[in-house]
Structure formats: C-alpha cells, structure tokens
Amino acid sequence: MIPTYNEIGNKCALIIRRVMEDGEQSHGKNVWFNNESSQRQVLLAARHLLTYQLQASGDKPADGDDHLVNALVRVAMAIAKRDECGTLSE
C-alpha cells in the first residue's frame, strides 16, 4: 500500500523530532551543523523543510513561509559553493 502524503509527513515529523531534539534546545547549533561546507547548507535546508512541514501540518506554530524560503536559499548556496569548487556535475 502506498502511503499518503499525510502519513509520510507524520513519519518525517517523528524523525525530525528524534534527530533534532538537541537542536531545539540549542536553536539548531549542535554538532551536526558546526562546519562550514556545502553539506552543512544541505543539512540546514533539510531542517528548514522539515520545520516547514511540521508547521504546515499544524504541529508547530506557523511563522509564514520563512522556513521554506530559508531552505531554498540554503540549497542555492550549496549549489553555488559546489559549482565554485568545480564539483557540480552537469
């Protein structure tokens, strides 16, 4: 049986709560994000997307589309950084 979007969202919510529970207490500045790299930008983008998903599902108070915008900016930064290093495959 194919899961619904709501079921997928609920699983994502459980995962992000489990993985990022330390991040909630320290505003996301835990060891996972303490390096300057394109990988860090992608991890932060994923966190923003998951936070946006939680807000959209009503599990967290919504503050507009800030997390969605931040996620898109982070991904763009990661792509630009990889492109500068010549590691972006076409």
How should each PLM-predicted stretch be described?
Residues 1-90:
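Intrinsically disordered, low-complexity regulatory regions
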